[in-house]
């Protein structure tokens, strides 16, 4: 029985004719022979549904994310999907942001324009972005901050540009702003208007590192918790420069030319937990550290400190409510470490938290 079935299948295969490639003309002849016209054949094909938003040429689109980075683009692509939430245009050759480049992008939350050649942004370019929260413009050629930024903005990063001025009017109405990054710009203290950041009531983080400023910017908002001013040309810290910063928890002033921290200056930052003053020109430990209730980390290495008093870091006695230090760095100072009293670091959490080392 099995042999009979196999024979039958082989016979069927042997009867099958060879495959013949058919062209459009062959199908037309078949239609003519069968009496079916072209219009009747294609009438049976159901109409296609309208296509959704088209992804720009060479870009990649997925789940409201449009990635157009590293494509050598010289301008913003047209016809971006209106539901885009994140638009990545970094590492291109875009030179200008024009009005209408972001039209209809009412759902955009994040715009990445890092590492282009942008030198001009039209005043109304960001107007359609009514939900924008994060704007990244670092590594471009901007000489000024963009005007009329969306009031929903929470994070602005514009480091490594050519910005020389920060006008107070630029930040007007940006009440949701939390982070501002302006480092590595040719900024001078005279280029930052007094109170330029004051109107941003929720501002928590400012970084203006590696610029030419010589003083701490005035009129900083009391909401600030982190202030990073490393790598500048600041020479002094006085009480007025830190006035009103009651919520400041981290202060970065390393790699400046600071020779003195005036008495009472640190009292204006009662919640300070971390202080970076390494790589400066200090000749003594800043006053007021012993009175700070919360400070836990102090970097003072690579200065000119030649003596350390027994009460420079800790209040008198041992039964205090001061937080214990978790890190104190004093290496690379011309201090005679064997002259330091054993009780000097009585409020340090563990002995290993103190870094002394040799002066070179």
Curated annotation (Swiss-Prot):
Sorted UniProt keywords: Disulfide bond, Extracellular matrix, Glycoprotein, Leucine-rich repeat, Proteoglycan, Repeat, Secreted, Signal
Post-translational modification: The attached glycosaminoglycan chain can be either chondroitin sulfate or dermatan sulfate depending upon the tissue of origin.
Keyword field contains Disulfide bond: yes
Recorded superkingdom: Eukaryota
Signal peptide: 1-16
Locations listed in the record: Secreted, Extracellular space, Extracellular matrix; Secreted
Propiece span(s): 17-30
GO cellular component, one term: extracellular space
Disulfide bonds: 55-61, 59-68, 314-347
Cited Gene3D superfamilies: Ribonuclease Inhibitor
Glycosylation site list: 34, 212, 263, 304
Pfam families recorded: LRR_8, LRRNT
Main location: secreted
LRR repeats: 74-94, 95-118, 119-142, 143-163, 164-187, 188-213, 214-234, 235-258, 259-282, 283-305, 306-335, 336-360
InterPro entries to which the protein is assigned, alphabetical: Leu-rich_rpt, Leu-rich_rpt_typical-subtyp, LRR_dom_sf, LRRNT, SLRP, SLRP_I_decor/aspor/byglycan
Family that this chain belongs to: Belongs to the small leucine-rich proteoglycan (SLRP) family. SLRP class I subfamily.
Quaternary structure and interacting proteins, as annotated: Binds to type I and type II collagen, fibronectin and TGF-beta. Forms a ternary complex with MFAP2 and ELN. Interacts with DPT.
The protein, known as: Decorin
Species lineage: Eukaryota, Metazoa, Chordata, Craniata, Vertebrata
Gene name of this polypeptide: DCN
